[in-house]
Swiss-Prot record:
<protein>
    <recommendedName>
        <fullName>Putative F-box protein At3g23970</fullName>
    </recommendedName>
</protein>
<dbReference type="InterPro" id="IPR036047">
    <property type="entry name" value="F-box-like_dom_sf"/>
</dbReference>
<feature type="domain" description="F-box">
    <location>
        <begin position="1"/>
        <end position="42"/>
    </location>
</feature>
<dbReference type="InterPro" id="IPR050796">
    <property type="entry name" value="SCF_F-box_component"/>
</dbReference>
<dbReference type="Pfam" id="PF24750">
    <property type="entry name" value="b-prop_At3g26010-like"/>
</dbReference>
<dbReference type="InterPro" id="IPR056592">
    <property type="entry name" value="At3g26010-like_b-prop"/>
</dbReference>
<dbReference type="InterPro" id="IPR001810">
    <property type="entry name" value="F-box_dom"/>
</dbReference>
Length: 413
């Protein structure tokens, strides 16, 4: 029976990506429809409100990587959280495996064979596609030993180039602080399959790097530092004209704001931007301020204050909390961890409505319509609460893309 093309289109565009991936491999006609730009644009316009994502912790060698998962959204139609889908199957015996970075649906992992050979892979866990990343041909023996001895995990990162909602390129980045003013980058590109060495200027680079894992967004890596009121950013897809890192001051680095600020500084991402948030107390009032990074400069014009709300609705319940992340798509939702309630508070900044979700409870629906699940989240939150320093990356997000994409691979020469 021949199905009219118009009906095929209307049926397919209402299916989740999980089903589209299966139908795409069944019939050539369906594949042609799904792969068209018009179909992709229609699908994304119908599914712009929610997507599966995870809150991941920054110490994966101590606990599980995913501490909070979101699944069951309309876009993907997953019945499990994204973190539970991260699996790796090798042809040889693996004695050690570690997830180094997650961004835009791709994962960078480190493995070590039973013979002690270190290997890195970039993969798409949903489709079980993995690409081995070769070591640079000029890599020194002592550098390999540093990898084997687990001294290079905070220095590894993954940046992505997106186009029309799909990943078209990625870069694996290794960092080697050289001295107080320069940093060496080793960069592997999926476009060329080659490594590139790059030297960038950065003030006090030995203090910036290796202390925290970076946050990747739009091909840019962002690093916090415990010793400064600023953070560092570097654009790996910005061309070769600018070899300098951007040093960006936090919007509350003035003395008066610093005295009123309650929490350590941290960064998150939301709605395509880097965001910074904190609580400020003045005259007995507690208010939450959220800034969006709009320019990669060092002055006050770098930030836009787009939320300032009273915390009376939260604090009247006696909730002792600290901020964790923003919702990656909905910039009005912030995630707070309540220590005395031992649960995650989802606070809507627009409506001042909040909901409390406990790890001990069954999976529940959250504000974006996804199903919320926990995995040793309470244990991790108690651990990081005791960490010192004025700045700290508490957690980051692993967000699945809004469209199907295969793993980018180098073009054959």
């Amino acid at each position: 029976m021949n199905i009219p093309p118009e009906l095929t289109f209307e049926v397919l565009v209402r299916l989740p990506l999980k089903s589209l991936a299966r139908f795409r491999s069944v019939r050539k006609e369906w594949k042609l429809v799904i792969d068209s730009e018009f179909f992709r644009d229609c699908f994304m316009s119908h599914n712009s409100s929610s997507v599966s994502w995870s809150i991941i912790q920054t110490r994966p060698h101590k606990l599980t990587l995913e501490i909070v998962g979101h699944h069951g959204c309309k876009t993907w139609g997953l019945t499990r959280s994204p973190g539970s889908l991260v699996g790796f199957f090798a042809d040889t015996t693996i004695k050690r495996l570690r997830v180094l970075a997650c961004t835009d649906g791709l994962v960078l992992i480190y493995t070590e064979t039973s013979y002690g050979t270190p290997m890195h892979y970039v993969g798409n866990p949903l489709f079980q596609e993995w690409c081995p990343i070769p070591l640079p041909s000029y890599f020194y023996l002592q550098s390999v030993e540093r990898i084997r001895n687990h001294q290079r995990f905070n220095d590894s990162a993954l940046v992505i180039k997106m186009q029309s909602g799909a990943v078209v390129s990625y870069k694996v980045v290794w960092l080697f602080p050289r001295n107080s003013t320069t940093i060496d980058f080793l960069i592997y590109s999926s476009d060329t399959g080659m490594w590139e060495a790059r030297i960038a200027t950065c003030l006090h680079s030995s203090f910036w790097f290796s202390h925290h894992k970076p946050i990747a967004l739009n091909g840019i890596l962002h690093w916090l530092c415990n010793f400064s009121t600023s953070f560092v950013a570097y654009d790996f897809y910005g061309g070769h004209d600018d070899y300098a890192c951007h040093i960006i001051s936090f919007p509350d680095c003035e003395k008066d704001d610093d005295q009123l600020r309650r929490f350590r500084r941290t960064l998150s991402t939301s709605d395509g931007s880097i965001v910074y948030f904190n609580e400020f107390g003045e005259n007995g009032n507690r208010r939450l301020r959220v800034w969006r990074l709009v320019k990669y400069t060092g002055g006050p014009e770098a930030w836009q204050l787009f939320w300032e709300v009273s915390l009376a609705s939260v604090t009247k319940l006696g909730i002792d909390y600290f901020p964790v992340v923003m919702h990656p798509l909905k910039s009005e939702i912030i995630y707070l961890w309540s220590r005395n309630k031992k649960g995650m508070v989802l606070f809507n900044l627009r409506t001042n409505v909040f909901s409390l979700h406990k790890e001990s409870e069954d999976e529940t629906k959250c504000m974006d319509g996804c199903t919320l699940s926990f995995n040793r989240c309470s244990e991790y939150m108690e651990t990081i609460h005791n960490y010192g320093g004025p700045n700290y990356l508490l957690a980051s997000q692993y967000v699945l893309p809004r469209w199907l994409h295969r793993l980018p691979r180098p073009q054959p020469s």
